[in-house]
Amino acid sequence: MNTFSVSRLALALAFGVTLTACSSTPPDQIPSDQTAPGTSSRPILSANEAQNFVAAHYFSSLTPNTAPWTPSAITLPAQPDFVVGPAGTPGVTHTTIQAAVDAAITQRSSKRLYIAIMPGEYQGTVYIPAAPGSLTLYGTGENAIDVKIGQAIDGEMSTTDWRRSVNPGGKYMPGKPAWYMFDNCQSKRGASIGVMCSAVVWSQNDGLQLQNLTIENNLGDSVDAGNHPAVALRTDGDKVQINKVNILGRQNTFFVTNSGVQNRLQNDRQPRTLVTNSYIEGDVDMVSGRGAVVFDNTDFRVVNSRTQQEAYVFAPATLSNIYYGFLATNSRFTAAGDGVAQLGRSLDVDANTNGQVVIRD
């Protein structure tokens, strides 16, 4: 049986939302029995309250008198700036994604640059640094699964093991654009690398666009049911767009932070992200972190093959001085196997955070 419930006061349901479990009737054909104000464990927004929780408000700027971000659909050029694929293939400029990213960042261009990725499996991390211009990475296959970026990284691994795993052959070296990101993590003095350095794809690029890709932390069920952060995608930049992307993992699958180049969380910055037409899979705190994130027409899938403990879809750490955290619209929530899948819990790591999620429509 697949059961969804709400943990703590982390999540509010907007008027008219439908959640189902153990039913053969299609979800869109079941009338909602949710009415405001709901209960202390399942707060429900009234129609008037729900009017405030729309994408335009999530994409507003923290800077006074600045217009909100109004993202438009991702458009692709007839000819990309860089092409990643097998050596010797006509048009290919690089055989690894990281090499193409490094080449793009090295140009120090203020315009958007496009990296096309041919179908195939690309093992290894991809670090996308902060830069004057924005990058678009997109798969050229028919489906998102045709381009797979993956590696197994456990946040509980030692710094030494992590260094050996993510930097074979000196992929990250002094003088290369992403060196500062690698160096911030390899310089950690703790017993383990931690969630902040466990990502397969990590971006600090403002305006980053990802489309038609699969990003997976391959750690999967190779570890026990304990604490094993294993981020597939981490984004720190503002105005990030993710469309038709599969984000796969277990714990902390998709991690949104507001960290600066020193890899430290900030209390005065709110990155904005739009996720559309995508698929996210995991178990514990599968979507977590700071920032304003709008999910539209996205599928969330909870899996319990690694742990039978309660799973959580959302774990926001919204800054307490900001009204908007995560918003899911026109989206679907499913779970595999038996057990309880919580829609969310607040990841209030300190006095500056008060997690907020709204699921509606």
Show which residues each predicted segment covers.
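Bacterial N-terminal signal peptides that target proteins for export
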Residues: 2-10
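Intrinsically disordered, low-complexity serine/proline/glycine/threonine-rich regulatory regions
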Residues: 12-14
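C-terminal motif of bacterial Sec signal peptides marking the signal peptidase cleavage site
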Residues: 18-21
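Bacterial signal peptide processing site
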Residues: 23-25
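Sequence-level preference for short, compositionally simple segments enriched
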Residues: 30-361
